[in-house]
Amino acid sequence: PVAADEVEEALNAKLEDKLNCTVDINYIALSDYTQKYSLLLASGENIDIIYTSTWAFYNEEATKGAFAEITDELLQKYMPQTAAGEDSMAFEQAKINGKCYMIPKNSPYVNNAMPVLIRGDLREKYGIDKIDSVEKLEEYFTAVAENEEGIYPYAAAGDAVEMSMNLFQSRNNLVPMSCGSGKYFGYFYQGKDPAAEDVVWQYGTDEYLEYCKLMKSWADKGFWSKNAVSNTTSPLDAFQNGTSAALFWNLDTCESAKNVVDSEHPEWKAELVNVTPGVVHVKGVYTGDGFAIPAVSENQERALMVLDVLKFDKECYDICRYGIEGSTFNATSDTTYTLGDEQANYAVSWGLKNDVLERIQGEAGTTQSEIRQELMGDAISEVTSGFIFDDSSVKSELAAMNEVCSQYVPLLELGLVDDVEGTLAELNSKCETAGAEKLKEEFISQFTAYLEGLEK
């Protein structure tokens, strides 16, 4: 972020006063983390605090011994505010074989709170009413594809996982379940917690086949580039620079992108829309964002003290989450804020999010946005959020399957194949060869034991 140095300087002024220490913050680009994250930890570089997540190798790195254990004693001694103020379920969800290696955010992720950010000016230009279904979104995409030059309806890139989370998982009430970095298992929510026999192999479901067929039809209509898999410009950047008419992402990211666009291009009339109304919104894990202490850190206790302050001290929290008051944000009350003129120069930090101290954008008295209430206000808790799969006995099978899926899944989910059914059958066949059956047996065994443990 452009304002990163200024934010770090302001934060260090507070930390020197409160803890007699400073931090030196380094960033890994989102486009590079899959290649660089594990290499950085393996290098032995003396890092004291590092972002981690269920989607950013938490399970894999923790089981390799890359992270220090976070015990209850350490929390009580060095993170008393966190120990007292954070939901204990967050630390339960972070446990692997009974041990915790993460300080999760104090804000549960809602698995399917997935809006779409669109260009309101283009919607109005082509006379399209409120977009509140996948069919209406397709109408909007078709109008853009047929009439606009230099703008894709959706500038997909890489694996387009954000789109599949919305239009496959959320649309079908499919709750994904933790299995390393793969998207292999889940269950269809039907008003009750699942039994072990309700767990499905996602790539073998009729719903996944229908999703891939829909993506094939959209790709054939030119909704994204034929080279989308190798596209290195993120959909977020594409929307903000005007080469994409939509953005699929989680609610926080879409709201942040809307803020940037509203500031830089108000004439685009950016709109957040919900194309899957009526689906069940399920609270997922706290471990969707958090921080770990690398095992090589020489300052582990001090690192925990710093995290405690960043998460629960109001002054430090505002700096970390919103930047510089009067520049990147303006506090309008103790609980609200408006965007500053330099807001685009600083991005909010995910891993520290704490619902106790979060501000709502707007003037004093502002309440949550309608779209946020719609997507998150009725979220329910369910049993699988605390289940973390231990992949230590199937690492080779998972590695082989990840390799297979990296070749097939992006093409299927972007519709860039000639024969959807044939390609999907080939994917499943190669996964079987790679060890899918062994993986499923181990997964079901662990999930069964997890359910039995909840009954004791």
Where are these regions (language model features)?
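Extracytoplasmic/secretory soluble proteins
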Residues: P1-K456
